Amino acid sequence: ILYEQPSYRGHQYYLWKGEYPDFQRWMGFNDSIRSCRMSPYHQGQYKMRIYERGDFQGQNMEFFEDCPNTYDRFRFRDIHSCNVFDGNWMFYEEPNYRGRQYYLRPGEYRRYSDWGASSARIGSFRRVHHLV
């Protein structure tokens, strides 16, 4: 996982297996990388519950699989809070795994700022798998 700022802050980018000759290939906003870390290996189930409002309020849904388009799936674009029970997940600001990325580990995220976002808009999300 690459971060634009020191101490794992700023825009984050998860690089899947492959080649990235320039920052635009990983959909970066610029070529500045100030910190990075490996994502932990996960083997087993994936489970996450998302909520339409903060503090785990409002309509919610559980997911075990990837979702390429949140609006098509459940008719809202904003995710205000979530619980990640199992596995590591990546939120994307736009559908089809595009735009700003937010890496989520197991834990509680009471508001979108807890995963580093400046807005609640999430267009897609997927499980983080390690390719061997």
Curated annotation (Swiss-Prot):
One Gene Ontology term of the molecular function aspect: structural constituent of eye lens
InterPro entries according to UniProt: Beta/Gamma-Crystallin (IPR050252), Beta/gamma_crystallin (IPR001064), G_crystallin-like (IPR011024)
Superkingdom of the source species: Eukaryota
Keyword Repeat (UniProt): yes
GO aspect biological process, one term: visual perception
Gene3D superfamilies the UniProt entry points to: Crystallins
Keywords: Eye lens protein, Repeat
UniProt domain Beta/gamma crystallin 'Greek key': residue ranges: 1-40, 46-86, 87-129
Subunit (UniProt): Monomer.
Family: Belongs to the beta/gamma-crystallin family.
Protein name: Gamma-crystallin-5
Organism the protein comes from: Xenopus laevis (African clawed frog)
